[in-house]
């Protein structure tokens, strides 16, 4: 009897081992990770902010969270005229990083097409990871150690999904906001192209947001949707952004370009204008569906489409929208890859990779990557600042 029991557990152990040997590589190939070693600093709310809301046409209210769970929390708030510079400070609890800037309260819609032959550095799907975003920019000489813009007249393309999942959404967005202003002063450009997760936060789908922001909104006396509404500075700023841009002959979109876009009688600026009207609407099928509706669909839309990697597209189908917009290639995020890669004979570049998390360790862990385009050549931009030609 004892021998039979031992034999049973031996077979069971071998079966489990074999399953693990099969499942672990499969899981890793799909981007699965095991998280451990969570840092409690993620729940440090002291100094969280700023959260800036329009009080009326002439005033905004700036709010910060102060305190801790032992002594309680309070809101530090102050009103400012929309006509004066609004000083702001952002705090990152993990390593006590702080940065300062001023907040304007009105925003211009960016251009959709750029031609200047300057360098382009693109990165996507940071998902609220402030540290990995900051460190990548420092090592690739976009900013200095004090988080100041050093990329001159060049282009930094942020290809969507910089929010959700992590604990540093506020810090990430304000760093982008700050760099956008600094780049402009030097003749450079920060292109924040919206992804599906920015849109989700705007139309009220917060399932992928960290639970932290449920409490943040409650402390501020707001709902989570109000953090990015048209009555919030971050909301108005996001709503000014594009979903597609052409920079020096390369297209940038978060999801991808469905082949049917080639049949639409719409330019890139017209697509952005149409999409901008829908940012605060969840995508849903309509009875009297306009043929432009597939642009916002959660399957075929510009911010959602995964067809380059999930469908059996021909080279001709892939190239139709690229040729329509007189471009050489399209760069996309949204669909995860082990590294920045080119597809379809160099017509598609996928740049969504796994990035390290701010407040917990992962196994396996991954280094960030981006895409550098210069002099017509495409390179993997590595986390340590080195380049690898594609």
Spans of model-derived segments:
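Feature recognizes metal-dependent phosphohydrolase scaffolds
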Residues: 2-390
């Amino acid at each position: 009897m004892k021998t039979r029991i031992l034999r049973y557990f031996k077979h069971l152990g071998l079966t489990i081992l074999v399953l693990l040997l099969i499942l672990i590589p499969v899981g890793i190939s799909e981007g699965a990770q095991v998280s451990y070693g969570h840092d409690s600093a993620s729940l440090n709310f002291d100094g969280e902010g700023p959260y800036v809301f329009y009080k009326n046409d002439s005033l905004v209210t700036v709010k910060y969270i102060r305190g801790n769970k032992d002594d309680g929390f309070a809101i530090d708030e102050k009103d400012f005229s929309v006509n004066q510079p609004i000083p702001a400070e952002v705090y990152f609890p993990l390593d006590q990083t702080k940065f300062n800037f001023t907040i304007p309260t009105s925003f211009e819609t960016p251009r959709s097409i750029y031609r200047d032959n300057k360098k382009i550095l693109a990165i996507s799907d940071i998902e609220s990871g402030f540290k990995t975003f900051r460190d990548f920019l420092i090592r690739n000489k976009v900013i200095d150690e004090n988080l100041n813009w050093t990329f001159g007249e060049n282009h930094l393309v942020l290809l969507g999904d910089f929010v959700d999942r992590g604990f540093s959404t506020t810090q990430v967005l304000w760093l982008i906001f700050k760099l956008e202003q600094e780049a402009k002063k030097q003749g450079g450009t920060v292109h924040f192209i919206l992804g599906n997760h920015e849109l989700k936060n705007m139309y009220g789908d917060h399932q992928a947001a960290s639970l932290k922001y449920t409490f943040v909104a409650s402390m501020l006396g707001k709902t989570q949707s109000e953090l990015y509404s048209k009555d919030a500075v971050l909301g108005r700023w996001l709503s000014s952004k594009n979903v597609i841009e052409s920079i020096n002959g390369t297209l940038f979109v978060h999801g991808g370009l469905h082949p049917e876009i080639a049949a639409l009688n719409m330019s890139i600026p017209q697509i952005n204008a149409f999409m901008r009207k829908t940012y605060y609407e969840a995508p849903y099928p309509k009875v009297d569906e306009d043929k432009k509706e597939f642009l916002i669909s959660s399957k075929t839309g510009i911010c959602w489409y995964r067809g380059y990697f999930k469908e059996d597209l021909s080279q001709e189908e892939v190239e139709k929208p690229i040729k329509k917009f007189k471009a050489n290639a399209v760069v996309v995020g949204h669909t995860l890859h082990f590294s920045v890669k080119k597809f379809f004979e160099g017509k598609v570049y996928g740049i969504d990779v796994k990035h390290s998390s701010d407040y917990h360790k992962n196994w396996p862990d991954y280094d960030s990557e981006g895409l550098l385009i210069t002099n017509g050549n495409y390179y993997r931009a590595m986390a340590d600042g080195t380049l690898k030609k594609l």
